[in-house]
Swiss-Prot record:
Signal sequence region: none
Transmembrane feature ranges: none
Oligomeric form and interacting partners: Homopentamer.
Chief localisation class: secreted
NCBIfam families xref list: PRK08453.1 (NF006282)
Protein name (Swiss-Prot/TrEMBL): Flagellar hook-associated protein 2
Subcellular location: Secreted; Bacterial flagellum
Annotated keywords: Bacterial flagellum, Coiled coil, Secreted
Listed InterPro entries: FliD, FliD_C, FliD_N
Domain of life: Bacteria
Gene name as annotated: fliD
One BP term from GO: cell adhesion
Length: 685
């Protein structure tokens, strides 16, 4: 032991040394520190053991909570006959057999678009153009630039629709195996893709419907469309419908009347047959759509057009080209050509001209050219249209090429959708998007998907294939007792793991005087008896005595719980309501008509366990907190005791050093006197 600078302690006395101090200190540490260390070790052991008990109680609480939950007793399972569908059912669904006839599955739209290519990196188009289509109540115009590859176009379609419509490059085989596919992500008739132009109606008129000739002898409703010869033709529509017809029935009748009228006209017969012109109902039959995938103009004419819900009676043509910027002010140089017709910019503009003056002069010059039309839009930019739907822009000389930028134009060729349709945008519908159609216990139902979860609450159906006539798929809904059985098995297992631990930690052997770590802790000693008191709970009913023994649960003479599954299953199947009342609880009314809930046995188990481990006021939580406080207090007491001993033996060492110094001085004096005596004696001799 080394304290301060007292390194020579004991040299004077040969007695007051560090060995003496260490022996004294060891004795004090055994008296003061050792008991605290032992208490701290016991505290740690108790905390570890308490964690184990709480963990075991939590394991017991899992199945107890399930068995004290009402939904466990109304759990259902389903069994499906046939391969037409799969089904799942939620808790509380009435026990029944559901017959489902599947006529059609919901499908997405699948289309081939354009020619085939040798590689996905092949150039799709040599001209600037726009792919136009309509789906899900929205019009899309996908810009396709000259030089874009097949893969680029596919990605542009997907990006423009945020993935609702997917451009896919599919390898189909052959010399040119790559084909652009345009498919919808989702199923249902409202996901159909209509290329080109379209008009849509929303019929709200519930009155009787008569389509014929008006007083002037004109058709009250007619379609004006581009025929197979490229010219516009008007086709009258005739129809009589009673007031009793629904909106859906009226739209279906109008659709049929329009199709028949077009099929009977030689200008449209083939166009209807090959799908270039189509008429469909959408939104569950509430809406009608007329589509020309060639992109031609569509017009609904006649006095009844608005009455039939056509708020817009003619398609609006898109402009072919809009300049990228307003035309530059001042004098412009060079010659440019539009469809081969030249414009001398130096002759059309002046140094003093504003941008607007230059624009007006150039528009006037363009409008004087054959087959071209130009105007200035609200942004002040140049807009050019061509009668043919095609526009070739060139700079005829070096100055003209440079001036194209000042006009907001680029050299190249631009085509409208209609002009590009027969070369770039030939489309073929391979699968038409449609709703699922099925009967549910005889009731006809349509849905946009094959996942059906809104017919009856809690019944979820996935349609997978159609059924044969008069051979419906049958969903058998029955009671599911498996959760009860599984939870009781878990309960038995958790109980049999908990009890031995409680016995070990609370035991006392009178012969050996050995006690468990929690032998004196009343709250822990009481756990087993509290659980066993609930286990022995019984109720007298009209059906006899209800107890856990009736359901196959028993305790042997060693306190080990067991479960007779056969007995349990028999009790569950014979009277499920009695099981629910005994396990979960039952409701009744008192004399005053007030609702009273009688707790079931597992609700009682749940309460016992909750009082032990749930929340800040739980018994074991309070005991755990007391152990934490004891641990902190013991740590503090040990620190104080160690500081006390340190101070005590520092002082003792200093005192020993002082005593030792005094003894050393006395020894020196004694030695001097002794020397003098010895010298005197020597002289006498």
């Amino acid at each position: 032991m080394a304290i301060g600078s007292l390194s020579s302690l004991g040299l004077g006395s040969k007695v007051l040394n560090y060995d003496v101090i260490d022996k004294l200190k060891d004795a004090d540490e055994k008296a003061l520190i050792a008991p605290l260390d032992k208490k701290m070790e016991q505290n740690v052991e108790k905390q570890k053991a308490l964690v184990e008990i709480k963990t075991l109680l939590s394991s017991l609480k899992g199945p107890v909570k399930t068995l004290s939950d009402y939904s466990t007793y109304i759990s259902r399972k389903s069994n499906v006959t046939g391969d037409a569908l799969s089904a799942s059912v939620g808790a509380g669904v009435p026990i029944q057999d559901i017959k489902v006839d599947v006529q059609n599955l919901a499908q997405g739209d699948i289309n081939e678009l354009g020619a085939k290519f040798s590689s996905r990196d092949d150039i799709f188009s040599q001209v600037d153009t726009t792919l136009k289509f309509y789906t899900q109540n929205k019009d899309y115009a996908v810009d396709i630039k000259a030089g874009m590859t097949l893969g680029d176009v596919a990605q542009s379609i997907t990006d423009a629709t945020n993935g609702e419509v997917m451009g896919i490059v599919m390898k189909t085989g052959g010399n040119d195996p790559y084909q652009l596919m345009v498919n919808t992500k989702n199923t249902g008739e409202d996901n159909r893709v209509y290329f080109g132009s379209h008009l849509q109606s929303t019929l709200t008129n519930k009155n009787a419907l008569s389509l014929g000739l008006d007083g002037a002898g004109k058709s009250e409703l007619s379609l004006n469309l581009k025929g197979a010869d490229g010219s516009m033709h008007e086709v009258p529509i005739m129809l009589e419908l009673p007031e009793s017809a629904s909106i859906k029935q009226k739209n279906a009748a109008i659709q049929k009347a329009m199709e028949q009228a077009l099929e009977n006209d030689p200008n449209f017969k083939d166009l209807i047959a090959n799908g270039d012109i189509s008429i469909d109902t959408l939104h569950g039959g509430e809406s009608l759509i007329i589509n020309d995938r060639r992109g031609g103009n569509i017009e609904v004419k006649g006095s009844k057009a608005k009455e039939l819900g056509f708020s817009q009676t003619t398609t609006q043509e898109s402009d072919l080209l809009k300049s990228a910027r307003t035309i530059k002010e001042g004098k412009l140089e060079g010659v440019v050509s539009l469809n081969g017709q030249k414009l001398d910019l130096s002759a059309l503009t002046k140094e003093s001209n504003t941008s607007e003056e230059n624009t007006d002069a150039i528009i006037q010059a363009i409008n004087a050219k054959e087959g071209l039309n130009a105007f200035k839009n609200a942004e002040g930019k140049l807009v050019i249209n061509s009668k043919t739907g095609m526009l070739t822009i060139k700079g005829e000389d070096a100055l003209g090429k440079a001036s194209l930028k000042d006009l907001g134009l680029s050299a190249g060729m631009v085509q409208s959708y209609e002009a590009s349709q027969d070369t770039l945008f030939m489309s073929k519908n391979l699968q038409k998007a449609s709703d699922s159609q099925f009967t549910y216990n005889g009731v006809s139902i349509t849905r946009p998907t094959n996942e059906v979860n809104d017919v009856i609450s809690g019944v979820n159906i996935t349609l997978e294939q159609t059924t044969e006539p008069n051979k419906p798929a049958i969903i058998s809904v029955s009671r599911d007792n498996q959760a009860i059985i599984d939870s009781l098995k878990e309960f038995v297992k958790a109980y049999n793991e908990l009890i031995p631990k409680l016995d070990e930690d609370t035991r006392y052997d009178a012969d050996t005087k050995i006690a468990g770590i929690f032998n004196g802790v009343g709250d822990i000693r009481a756990i087993r008896s509290s659980l066993n008191n609930v286990f022995s709970y019984s109720v007298h009913t009209d059906n006899g005595v209800e107890s856990l023994m009736k359901y196959g649960l028993s305790l042997d003479d060693k306190g080990v719980m067991s479960l007779d599954e056969a007995k349990l299953s028999s009790a569950l199947n014979s009277n499920p309501k009695a099981t629910q009342d005994f396990f979960y609880g039952s409701d009744s009314k008192d004399m005053g008509g007030r609702e009273i809930h009688q707790e079931g046995i597992f609700s009682k188990f749940n309460q016992v366990i909750a009082n032990l481990i749930d929340g800040g006021n739980a018994k074991l939580k309070i005991y755990e907190d007391s152990l934490d406080r004891d641990a902190k207090s013991l740590t503090k007491d040990k620190e104080n005791a160690q500081e006390l001993l340190k101070t005590r033996y520092n002082i003792m060492a200093e005192r020993f050093a002082a005593y030792d110094s005094q003894i050393s001085k006395a020894n020196q004096k004694f030695n001097s006197v002794q020397m003098m005596i010895d010298q005197a004696a020597a002289k006498k001799n």
